[in-house]
Amino acid sequence: MSGEAVREQRIQWPVAGVSRVPFEIYTDPALYESEQESLFKGPIWNFVAADIEIPAVGDFKTNFVGDTPVVVVKSSADSYSAFVNRCAHRGSTLCYEKTGNRDAFTCVYHNWSYDLEGNLKTVAFHKGVRGKGGMPDDFQTCDHNLQKLRVQVFCGLLFISFDHAAPDLEKFLGPKMSAHIRRIFSKKIRILGAFSQYMHNNWKLYMENVKDSYHASLLHTVFTTFKVNRLSMQGGLILEGDGGHHISYSKMATDSGGGADYESGGLRAQNDEFVLHDNRILKSWPEFEDGITHAIQGIFPNLIVQQIQNSLALRLLIPRGVNGCELVWIAHQDNYRRNATVLGSAELFHRVRPLYDAYADCIDEEQFEKWPEFFEDICFYQITTREAVRKSFPIGIVQCNSKGMLIDRINSMKRANIFEPQRYRHLLGALHVEASENGTIRARMGFAIVRILESGETMLFLSGVWKDKIVETPEGLRFREKIAVLDSSCVDTLIVVPV
């Protein structure tokens, strides 16, 4: 009996005309393995990178298509190559770095070396040593190239396919999806930040979630309360072909009210007691002539293109086994801006250390309402990663520009966010302090955060370093700038409480 027939027996599909699907499609390991071959390696296209991420010849990025590791590289001034990230000799990982620049890829195991197009060029001891050993006489390097993949570029987005007979990328996308991508990527972009989070669910659930416009104004309190995205606005759902690709959109300026509809239903999403102390986060400007202010586009199976007002991002979905997936966020903009910063110098260790002790204790003891008081009124708070700092990405996983925004974040945590009950414990490292001539103190301290769940399960949640600016105020020392630089670029699930 074929594998398909076995799955057909194990997974009981409903009768024709019923829209519900068996829950087993999200939990069946055999189906997951089948998806890797028939779907991700089938006649489709998978997003892997933006061209701006690998601008120079030799620049590369490693990624995954399904759960298969791949490399995409700029192999010449006007072309890209991609191949499976496994040596053709023994299948070991060829490239361990996430990004970089090379003129060749050499396997560390046996030193087989490949050019930028994946062609095998050199084999260590090809002819043996001192006349002994070596490869067989009929060994040809051209027979042992890497598994090459098709690459096509559309509006600066790089897609790859395992199927060399797959239709061209633009045909795969379809006219409606292609038009929306052109709308978003009408100009060259600049990458602002890239971060990832691990989610404990089957990858298909996330792709279905972004297509589910039913939940958006019911679950997301900020969207409904502050009229960012509501059912009372003009909008809709656009499907392409068989419905695998989609766009859900709304136009904020067309809101007809509708608050009574939410209130009469007793829905949590409409919360008139939820107010912002700093509403700059809601301010936006018309960036597109069509008036669309909220658009989520899903390109099946692994890409989401986001426009939430002026917040633009790509989301890359990577399966991590049948019960997990990783979501990579790539934020971008199409004009270059950078804010200058001023750093200081000199020692104030004996005064600064108690500030950090009190800061960590405030979070660990869940006194979250007091957390914003550690900051100046005009301040900068950011959670980012070492990888993002290395690449000079200006935005973070979390970012606030005033004490008001910090207060709003705590209110959101209490009123809008839904998450499993958990507690945290900070472990603080060595403190390094110096002050500038204008009185601004620059401080740096390592930290680790342990997370304790309701079940009692205890785990290392985050580790990193704070890079801060501290100033003297009438109330004492306060943070003017606090940047938490995380060691890992992948966060387990999400960050809710302060770091």
Protein language model regions, located:
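Short, contiguous pre-domain boundary segments
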Residues: 8-23
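Non-catalytic accessory segments flanking enzyme active sites
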Residues: 19-21, 25-65, 70-71
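Rieske [2Fe-2S] iron-sulfur-binding domain
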Residues: 54-164, 171, 175
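Generic beta-strand structural signal
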Residues: 64, 74, 114, 152-153, ...
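C-terminal catalytic domain of Rieske-type non-heme iron oxygenases
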Residues: 149-342, 346
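Short, low-complexity N-terminal intrinsically disordered segments enriched in polar/charged residues
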Residues: 343-365, 373-377
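A solvent-exposed, acidic/Ser-Thr-rich amphipathic alpha-helical stretch
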Residues: 377-446
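A beta-strand edge to alpha-helix "cap/lid" segment located at domain peripheries
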Residues: 432-499
